[in-house]
Every structure is written in structure tokens, then in C-alpha cells.
Amino acid sequence: TNLDFIIGPLYPEQIAPLSKFCQQHHIKLVVPFSSLGDNVYENPYYYAINPPKSYQFAEASRLTTELFGKDNVIFLEGTENDKDAAAFIDATRKRLQQNGSKANRLKLNDDEIKWMETMTQYKDNVIIPNSSGIKLLNQLFPKLKEFTKKNPEYRIKLVGYPEWQTYASNHLENFYQFNTYANSTYYKNPLNVKDEEIDKANQNAI
């Protein structure tokens, strides 16, 4: 075969045989429509635009541990339940334990004394919320601003989720202020005019 790559297939049941074919013939396979199956683990020619969430969580937790494993990692519990966030936090917690590190836990509504006990002046405090929702951020940022105003010597970073990119119109300055990181398989630049043009075109097409 003289193919360089194949885009597809459309149906999930076609993925396994096509993946096998591409691996045998050294053809790159780009799968844009489905994240089902574990071919991404087994086939080096397999590129999943929407990879399995288990793979995303594993990679995100690995990068998080590499970047912040020596910092004061804090898992922040809000009032919402988020299965994806919980899976990411669990994977990160296990990786930290494997590396001999330990994360702290803090509740959003804990009092100031508890926040002071959990934070440290001697390391970066890396806060990972248990929700990707904007509701938690709306509650968290005022609390962080109040805390850092009273305690400017504390360094705080946030680690979050792909959805946070869509909150840039509300929280871009807050993201900058608290040195925010978000794991994601895509990136949307809120300051790029071309991104705005694409958004408008999509809205007009609906």
C-alpha cells in the first residue's frame, strides 16, 4: 500500500480491524469520531483525537505529578460531584503515593484556621479542585483573593480541567493571578481573533 494515513472509520465496530490493518502495513490511522477501545495503548500508528478518558486521566496525572510532585499538593473538595474530576484526582493521588509524596485535603467551606494549617509558606501550594464546574471557581476565587491579601507570602497555583478554557471570558485575570494550569487535549486561545471568528461561524451555522 502507498497510503500515508487513513482518517476514520465512522463506526466503532470498524475501529479494531482497521487498526490491525494499519499496524500491519505501517499506516497512520486518525480516529476522530470515537474514543472506544484500548487501541491507543497497543498500536503506535493509532492516533485518537478523542482518546479514552482513562488514558487522558493517566497522562494528566503523570504530568501533574512530574510538575508538582515536590510541591504542597492540595485536593480541594467543593459541593459538587464530578466523576471525571474524581477519577483524575484519584489517579494523581496514587501517583504521588508511588513517588513517596502525600497530598493534603481541604474543603472549600473550611474555616481560615484549617486553610492556614493546610497551606505552607515554604513550597508552592498547588490546589486541585474536585470539580470542573464554573460554580466552584466562582466560590473559590474570592476565597483565594481574601487569603492571599491577608497572607501575601503564600504562593498558590491551580490545576484544573479542559472545561476551564471556556470560562476565560469570566475568569481570565483570575487564572493569571493564580498561575493556573489545565489538562486538555485541545487549546483555545481566548485572545486570538481567529478563534473568535471560528466561534461566530459555528454559531451562525447552527
What are these regions (language model features)?
Residues 1, 95-120:
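A short, well-structured beta->alpha microelement
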Residues 2-10, 29-33, 72-78, 123-140, ...:
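Periplasmic-binding protein-like
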Residues 7-91, 165-168:
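Extracytoplasmic ligand/sensor domains, especially the bilobed periplasmic-binding protein
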Residues 17-21, 63, 87-91, 115-118, ...:
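A short acidic, amphipathic alpha-helical/loop segment
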Residues 25, 99, 151-154:
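Helix C-cap/helix->beta junction micro-motif
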Residues 40-45, 112-118, 164-178:
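Glycine-rich, charge-decorated loop segments at or immediately adjacent to ligand/cofactor-binding or catalytic sites
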Residues 75-77, 83-87, 91-106, 164, ...:
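Cysteine-dependent hydrolase recognition
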Residues 141-206:
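Extracellular/periplasmic periplasmic-binding protein-like sensory domains
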